[in-house]
């Protein structure tokens, strides 16, 4: 799958279902805890520097951001979870917004769940994965920050994540570095299977 980086646009930042765009395209959700590098991942996958705004402040994305990717699919950036400085009320509101989207959106074909390759999945990572499985959403786990791990240890870290998440055999996992940017085609190939 090839995408033209010049044909990418942010359609809308939505907080409720009536704002979701009607494009007729399949959607791929991107979830992950705050600061796992979702915006950086989006930018590296589409070959644009600042399409998805990156922030040093975790918990910045508070809307569902719908990106039309070259009229081939829509990336949906979901608010990061597990950020302590967000009030309980805000967390509950995010939770409801995400649940509505995941449980009711027919266009949603796949969720890419980003986890940090360097660490064990957090309780929130495990909850999110189980939540996606509860709603029978195909899930593709991308373990970010691969460049921060010695090459010989990557497989061990991936196996650990698979075990801790109790991943289903049909769900795929890959390690990725936005710095190296060398596995984009593999990731697009997995995405393409679900469109």
Swiss-Prot record:
It comes from the Bacteria. GO terms for cellular component: cytosol. GO terms for molecular function: GTP binding; metal ion binding. Residues 24-195 form the EngB-type G domain. The keyword Amino-acid biosynthesis does not apply. GTP binds at residues 32-39, 59-63, 77-80, 144-147, 176-178. GO terms for biological process: division septum assembly. InterPro entries: G_ENGB_dom (IPR030393), GTP-bd (IPR006073), GTP-bd_ribosome_bio_YsxC (IPR019987), P-loop_NTPase (IPR027417), Small_GTP-bd (IPR005225). Its cofactor is Mg(2+). Mg(2+) binds at residues 39, 61. Keywords: Cell cycle, Cell division, GTP-binding, Magnesium, Metal-binding, Nucleotide-binding, Septation. Belongs to the TRAFAC class TrmE-Era-EngA-EngB-Septin-like GTPase superfamily. EngB GTPase family. Necessary for normal cell division and for the maintenance of normal septation. This is Probable GTP-binding protein EngB. It comes from Staphylococcus saprophyticus subsp. saprophyticus (strain ATCC 15305 / DSM 20229 / NCIMB 8711 / NCTC 7292 / S-41). The gene is engB.
